[in-house]
Amino acid sequence: MNEKRYRAVLFDLGGTLRIALEDEPYMRHARRKMTELAGAPLQVEDFYQLVEDRYESYRRGALGENKEAGDRELWCRWLLPDYDQKRIAQVCHELSFEYRQSKGRRVVVDGGAEVIRTLHERGYKLGIVSNLIG
């Protein structure tokens, strides 16, 4: 009997298939870019801390309700409601991207790409299950 027992393999993304390496210059650049995008009058680290504090509050509520906001709602309603809403709406996707980068440089774990290729070549359906922002 040569029938496969499994037809699909699902992977968690953050911390399993992909990890964030602490790369301070990379992370600092992302924090600076966030500050510029928002037009924040604060110092970079002060602005970043403001976003972090508000994100923690948002995240608790989102997890409690099992519902995440899209980029526009996240930045306009939860993270930067006191900033120029037109500007924030225009750059909300970039803000989300830079926020992720501020947590570290994302890389696929050693051997991860090879595992994906091998499973694909063997005919498995592949998927990702994740609770990451963005």
Where are these regions (language model features)?
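Short histidine/acidic/glycine/proline-rich micro-motifs that form metal-
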Residues: 17, 61, 134
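Soluble or luminal CAZymes and related metallo-dependent hydrolases
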Residues: 26, 67-71, 104-111
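Alpha-helical elements of Rossmann-like donor-binding domains used by nucleotide-donor carbohydrate transfer enzymes
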Residues: 29-33, 53, 74-77, 114
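Glycine-centered loop/turn motif at secondary-structure junctions
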Residues: 39, 83-84, 120-123
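A metal-dependent, Asp-based hydrolase signature
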Residues: 49-96
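Substrate-recognition element of Asp-dependent hydrolases with the DxDx(T/V) motif
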Residues: 91-108, 112-134
